[in-house]
Amino acid sequence: MLSVTAKKRILADIKNVSNDDIKKQGIFYSMNEADMTKGTALIIGPADTPYEGGFYFFGVQFPPDYPFAPPAMTSLTQDGITRFNPNMYREGKVCLSLLNTWHVGERWSGCQTLSSILLSILTSVLVNKPIQNEPGFETRTESEQSHVYARMVLHANLQTAALKMIQSPPEYAADFYDTMADAFNKNKKKLVDLAVGLQEYDNKTETMDFFRMTITYKFSTVADKIRDCVPRNPFPTEIE
């Protein structure tokens, strides 16, 4: 059972994460109307990273003793193949010091908020050279492995996090779909350009043994599908 302190703090965090300044950075949140301790967060991948224009969803679960313990977070944007980031596991685990799921870096304290967690993911996880987040690879950002991994993530970002999410959105995306459609239309040309710029890799297979990933690129096909995609909200809307 939630304490009065936990209820007040959760509501305050939700209000804070829903303000315009946070939304301008591509961060959005929807509370579960049946259970305020549960919710879904959306981070739109930042420009100039392999995550650009992708829709990255996270399940949020506040604990009964919030804010004395951090919320639990689950990475929902998955394709079953790609390790989208060293901090985001295929099974959904989010490895972050603020969540007390990683031992290096700033730990959770009661002064932290849901906003600070999501901003940390935006700025420290969804980065230009994601391999730098893997222990032992911090100084190997210009290595061949770094470039291969970033390319694999970008392909999955375009194919799954951007295109599939807008064409076949899961139920948890319902509250965000109009925002997603606006972002997709705004970013469409850039997403197509990113795919076209790497079409020389079409039909080439690359492997990242460290993350157990193998991918055969289809950048031209992805570019065509993004170019032709017209977002249509599949979720029923209430008629007043």
Predicted regions and their residues:
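UBC/E2-like fold recognition across ubiquitin and ubiquitin-like conjugation systems
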Residues: 1-54, 61, 65-240
